[in-house]
């Protein structure tokens, strides 16, 4: 793309930011050895009905693929209200917040999904936050997603897998331009 930093880039936040994060996680984590296989996946067709995530979740079930957890990064880069995010999640124009992360998941307090959220938050607080130059605030949300909305973690949950969604506190809307 030959646009400079001032060009409009619809889609960069939903979900270009999530794709960039998945690629960077794969790059960094490829240097280590793990006891289990980690799949770094991006899917298409979320706005058209979770097409890609439904397809892979259904495939995983029919092929008996053991998935321990699904961590969905959807809309994770919007930090400036009015540029990369818009109401209702923004408290005001030009408000900047790169330190708040919301964790959405299905079920009650003891569900596998909420337990996964609590585990991630605890591990972050004990292992990562003390080393972070700018600490993050992780907030476990009570709902599976925003009202009337859905993301790519839902088809995995519907197929019996523990699944959560990470998202920025300042979330995008239809007025985003960056």
List each language-model region with its residue ranges.
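Short, mixed-charge, low-aromatic patches
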Residues: 12-15, 159-160, 164-166
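Acidic side chains
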Residues: 1-4, 13-15, 72-74, 152, ...
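Metal-dependent peptidase/peptidase-like ectodomains
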Residues: 43-154, 159, 163
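Catalytic-core environment of secreted peptidases
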Residues: 1-41
